[in-house]
Structure formats: C-alpha cells, structure tokens
UniProtKB/Swiss-Prot annotation:
InterPro entries on file: Ribosomal_bL9 (IPR000244), Ribosomal_bL9/RNase_H1_N (IPR009027), Ribosomal_bL9_bac/chp (IPR020594), Ribosomal_bL9_C (IPR020069), Ribosomal_bL9_C_sf (IPR036791), Ribosomal_bL9_N (IPR020070), Ribosomal_bL9_N_sf (IPR036935)
UniProt keywords, alphabetically: Ribonucleoprotein, Ribosomal protein, RNA-binding, rRNA-binding
Cellular component aspect of the GO annotation: ribonucleoprotein complex; ribosome
Species of origin: Dehalococcoides mccartyi (strain ATCC BAA-2100 / JCM 16839 / KCTC 5957 / BAV1)
Gene that this sequence comes from: rplI
One GO BP: translation
Gene3D superfamilies registered for this protein in UniProt: Ribosomal protein L9, C-terminal domain, Ribosomal protein L9, N-terminal domain
Record family assignment: Belongs to the bacterial ribosomal protein bL9 family.
Function summary: Binds to the 23S rRNA.
Record's protein name: Large ribosomal subunit protein bL9
Entry-linked Pfam families: Ribosomal_L9_C, Ribosomal_L9_N
Lineage summary: Bacteria, Bacillati, Chloroflexota, Dehalococcoidia, Dehalococcoidales
Example of a GO MF term: structural constituent of ribosome
Length: 151
C-alpha cells in the first residue's frame, strides 16, 4: 500500500514522503496513529503543491539574504561606549550590542549568532566584524567604537 507520511517515522520515511509499505503496517499502525495516510491522486497533488510552495519560500529567503549581504558588506557602524582609564571599556562589546546597533543604524535585523568577532572588544578603536549568513555567504562590516560623551 502506498502511503504519504504525515510525520517522520524513523527508518521508514520523513514528512511528505510517499512510500510503499506493508498493508498491515499501514492499516494497523501508521494510519490509526496519524503518522501516514493512504496516497491518492488528490493527496499526491496537494503534497507536490506544498513542496513547490516551500521551494519558492526558500528561494525567496535566499535572495533576501544575498541582498542583505550585499547591502551590509563594507558598511561602517559607529558605536559609543562608556570608558574608563586608558580608553578601556567598562565591560566589553558583545554581539548582542553590535546587532542592536546595526539594526538601529541601518534598519536591517541581524541575528547576533551570525556575528563573528576575531577577539573580544574591550578597548576603543576600529574592528572588523564578519556576518556569516550561511557557509557560503558572508559580509564584513567596520565597527568604530568611540567614547561616550559625559554630560
């Protein structure tokens, strides 16, 4: 019997797969537990439509990511921080702070986990921050850390 898997079943199939399984296994286990349903022409076309929509969504997300990488590559971000003696910062600049500052200055939302620092930022100066969108796509921004004005 051909079934369409509604959920992942280890060793049998993943969600959306259409596979041939034993009739008894399908009728007694998969279908009653709502892990699969019999594969009919309507179900097959519905699954194909869902997969096509998912592919379009992934392609659109990839295109947006590439556009964002192009826009941010080489961007200059200025960050003001409180300092103590000898231009040392109170604490350090984290990826959370950098991501918030990028969003504030450019309007582009970046996940803090995508930011890579060569070293912790504990002093004033210019730093290069890598934004790794995926294994093949990355951008570099220039981060200028300056002293906050005391008022």
């Amino acid at each position: 019997m051909k079934v369409v898997f509604l959920k992942d079943v280890p060793g049998r199939g993943k969600t959306g797969d259409i596979k041939e399984v034993n009739d008894g296994y399908a009728r007694n286990y998969l279908i009653p537990n709502k892990l699969a349903m019999p594969a009919s022409a309507a179900v097959k076309s519905e699954i194909a439509a869902k997969q096509a929509a998912e592919e379009r969504r992934k392609a659109k997300a990839e295109a947006e990511m590439v556009e964002l990488a192009k826009n941010l590559d080489g961007a200059k971000v200025n960050l003001k921080a409180k300092t103590g003696a000898k231009d040392k910062l109170y604490g350090q600049i984290t990826t959370t702070v950098i991501a918030a500052e990028i969003e504030k200055q450019t309007g582009k939302t970046i996940d803090k986990r995508k930011l890579e620092l060569a070293e912790p930022i504990r002093q004033l100066g210019n730093y290069e921050v890598v934004i790794r969108f995926n294994k093949d796509l990355s951008s570099k921004i220039n981060l200028a850390v300056t002293a906050e004005e005391n008022t």
